[in-house]
Amino acid sequence: MATVTLNVKTVRPLGERVLVKVSQSEEKTAGGILLPDTVKEKPQIGEIIAEGPGRRNDDGSFQPLEVTVNSKVLYSKYAGTDIKLENEEYVLLSEKDILAIIA
């Protein structure tokens, strides 16, 4: 059986999905207390690393996504599938789970 090495460059989302690199959560509180992983909030902000071709129209063409690679986005808290690639945290989301583009 062949093995496949997954890295960011080999993951290509399908349809209207995007791969988002999750921003790091805060390590300390404002008072300087270190936070263990079990109490850290899951970040909801990240940068789009890869995108699918978009939604397929009735005529077979694709409607492009509203977001683009390198856009910083805010997404729903419980949306998507968490993925760990090359020791970095990513989330695979549908475009509909993206709430806003951050300028």
Curated annotation (Swiss-Prot):
Keywords: Chaperone, Cyanelle, Plastid. Its main location: plastid. SUPFAM superfamilies: GroES-like (SSF50129). GO terms for biological process: chaperone cofactor-dependent protein refolding. Together with the chaperonin GroEL, plays an essential role in assisting protein folding. The GroEL-GroES system forms a nano-cage that allows encapsulation of the non-native substrate proteins and provides a physical environment optimized to promote and accelerate protein folding. GroES binds to the apical surface of the GroEL ring, thereby capping the opening of the GroEL channel. The lineage of its organism: Eukaryota, Glaucocystophyceae, Cyanophoraceae, Cyanophora. Coiled coil: none annotated. It is found in: Plastid, Cyanelle. This is Co-chaperonin GroES. The gene is groES1. Belongs to the GroES chaperonin family. Heptamer of 7 subunits arranged in a ring. Interacts with the chaperonin GroEL. GO terms for molecular function: ATP binding; metal ion binding; protein folding chaperone; protein-folding chaperone binding; unfolded protein binding. CDD domains: cpn10. GO terms for cellular component: cyanelle. InterPro entries: Chaperonin_GroES, Chaperonin_GroES_sf, Chaprnonin_Cpn10_CS, GroES-like_sf. It comes from Cyanophora paradoxa.
